[in-house]
Amino acid sequence: MVITGHRQERYSVLIVDDEPAVCKVLADFFSGLGYRTGQAAHGGEALARIEEEVPSIVISDIRMPVMDGIELFRIIRERYPGIRHVLMTGYNVDEYLSLIRRHNIGNILVKGPDFNLREVGQSVGSLLTGDIFGLERYFPGQKLKRAVIESYARSEAVCSLIVQECAGRPDPYLHMAVDELIANAVFHGALHSAGISREEWQADTVIDAENAITVTWACDAERIGVAVEDPKGNLKKVDALRWLDKDDPSGRDLEEHGRGLYLVRRFIDRFIINIAPGRRTECIIIQYFNRDHLHQFKPLWINEI
């Protein structure tokens, strides 16, 4: 989602990176959208800028001299809890997951020569407005298709419909990923709340209508996206981070739910988790048809409001 209209003017973005070229690219991009922008070369300079004018959001590199992005994140959270903060790195985000978990960080962008500014704008726009839900934010103007699932037994049919959208552009992981997300939503979102254990769960167990799972999908010329939503909001950001951490021995190999999320992130180009605790959980996957120009590393998007 990129904010449009005159609303951007009330938001300011502070960009923190020791690479002037990165600061300029992002400053030009956000200025072009109508945001007020500022720049700093490291965390210490960023804090000095914040004392002069508190920004709406800070986008900072992780590796910087004087003060790195993790320490800056910690200080901002402590002193300025109202400031949104997104980290960015040119390295593998997964290598930072233990550190990310320690600070409960949910949003990390991947920078590089092929900086995906559309994704940057969508991520920042959603964080600023708090309007994080909905596949349409990533596929504006595209027709959305929707299915309601009241039993896991319907998963295969829905997965097949979605895969058909990729006719002529087969993807070996899309079916698996959607099925994993539906299974997680059905059990952990609905049946678990109803007191049904995994041992009692059958594929044809029916969910009552108010707890049904919604699957939405859309595609454009470049990619296909799928959103799986449950109305319970049982997933916690801290658990999602733990399950995604490949170095945590207490995670995926012990829990089906965690293993599924780990596999989805590993094999899908973009994985976004949106959580409103106790109200709804939405997992969005986006798979590109042509990966030749994709950055080798993936961003991290876990939003909990």
State where each predicted segment sits:
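Non-catalytic signal-transmission and effector/linker regions of two-component phosphorelay proteins
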Residues: M1-S12
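Two-component/phosphorelay signaling modules centered on CheY-like receiver
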Residues: Y11, P20-G38
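Helix N-cap/capping motif at the beta->alpha junctions
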Residues: Q39-A48, G69
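Active-site beta3 strand of CheY-like receiver
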Residues: E53-I59
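Receiver (REC) domain active-site loop signature in two-component systems and cognate sites
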Residues: M64
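Bergerat-fold GHKL ATPase/HATPase_c domain
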Residues: V110, G121-M176, F187, L191, ...
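Conserved beta-strand-loop-beta-strand hairpin that lines the nucleotide-binding pocket
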Residues: E136-K143, V186-I305
